[in-house]
Amino acid sequence: SPMSRGLGDVYKRQDHNIEVPLNYDRPEDRKINIFIRKVSRQESLQKSLPYLIFFQGGPGYESPRPISDSGWIKRATEDYNVLLIDQRGTGLSSPICSDSIKNMEDNYLAEYLSFFRADNIIRDAEYIRENIFSVNKWSVLGQSFGGFCAMNYLSFFPEHLDKVFITGGIPPLNAHPDEIYRATYKRVLKKNKLFYEIFPQAKINAKKIADFISENDVKLPNGDILSLRRFQQLGLNLGFSDGMATLNFLFERAFINGELSEYFLKQVLC
């Protein structure tokens, strides 16, 4: 069966590193690298299959790396050559991380980061479509934040899209962002309440962790300061199907000998 075969027997992968402008309005200025991986089924190489480019969620996550013949990539490669793009700033596409930005002045950094939004992500895709794969149209799959990229693509370059699949992340068309945030706040409160109802010990552990952070200078493995706000960002896990259990088990392992454990700090950093 395909599951028992090596990935090389199932897929052909072709990697591209492409130089694109940081700012498309000034293409002669600074360039950045964009990494994209073409994944095709070996059995379909003789077919002229269309292209499907995948926009990952996050924002900030790299494109998936196929490690098994399963999931949506298995299904998509039956009908498409799948293009897995590391959106600018992620993965192998001029990644934004502490190492890459540590020498940038604050004002320059703020301007630099402004070029890593959905509008330029789709311009990268257009550059690749036209200059690397030379096709007039292709299809798009957007997951979570990738759905915002897909909608952006539909707004600016609809003539080059065949089909658009969105599995989450649809921006409001006529509502103000504040309305979305107000609705989100209510959802967050409900999620927190439910979390502590299911795992009452987690509430005690969370307070213990918060008190420790408030009273001590805590640093993460990369040197960043662990603030209360950074700790609160773990609530992002409540949006995942198994997130409540994940958080509860993480809080259980937060302390060793009265100090925040290395395991806990590494998980916060992840």
Question: What are these model-predicted stretches?
Answer:
Residues 1-11:
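Single conserved hydrophobic/aromatic residue that forms the stacking wall/gate
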Residues 9-223:
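Gly/Pro-rich cap/lid or specificity-loop segments adjacent to the active site
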Residues 218-270:
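Alpha/beta-hydrolase fold active-site neighborhood
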